Amino acid sequence: STLITLNTIAHHHHSMLQSSTSFQDLWLVLFDHTKIREDLKRTVNLGPFKEKIDDGLPIRKAAYTCILTMLTTMPSHVDVNRFASYLASGLAERESDVKMLCYHIMTKICAMVNARDVLMPVLDDLMVPLARTINKRLDKVLKTKANEASIQRVRQLLFSAVRAVESL
């Protein structure tokens, strides 16, 4: 809930964050919350099946949402050099919600002045998960009899990926 509150402050009262002396420390906390934590994963028995639950997913989504909000509301106060590697790890995740947020962040970075220079050194790291997402999702839709909702979700993910590539 702290990250959601931070996102609200960044969206509506970003001048409070900009004037804060610990603004740069805030980025370190956000980056720390984008990491996958194994201690927040658990396995649930569902009769003959076992399902892995990632309790850290909402935290990671909230952290990436805060980053996106800060890029949108106060781009001049954001040092995009700091989170290119975190962006690559977010693109490599299994969860499509996190990937879509990272694609959106990538598009925002490319729209910023001279921000393309930030992503070019790590372009290979970004393209591997991007290509994997496109190929895997297309393969999944074509080989399975997916329902309309999952087809739409895959379509949105692919559209976000293509838009991110186009922005580069």
What are these regions (language model features)?
Residues 14-16, 49, 112-116, 120, ...:
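Alpha-helical rod/repeat scaffolding segments in eukaryotic adaptors/tethers
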Residues 2, 41-42, 62-65:
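Walker A/P-loop NTP-binding motif of AAA+ ATPase domains
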Residues 50-67, 73, 77:
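Extended repeat-based solenoid scaffolds, especially LRR ectodomains
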Residues 2-14, 30, 66-72, 90-91, ...:
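Hydrophobic residues within the alpha-helices of tandem HEAT/HEAT-like
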Residues 33-59, 134-159:
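Acidic, Ser/Thr- and Gly/Pro-rich intrinsically disordered linkers and low-complexity segments
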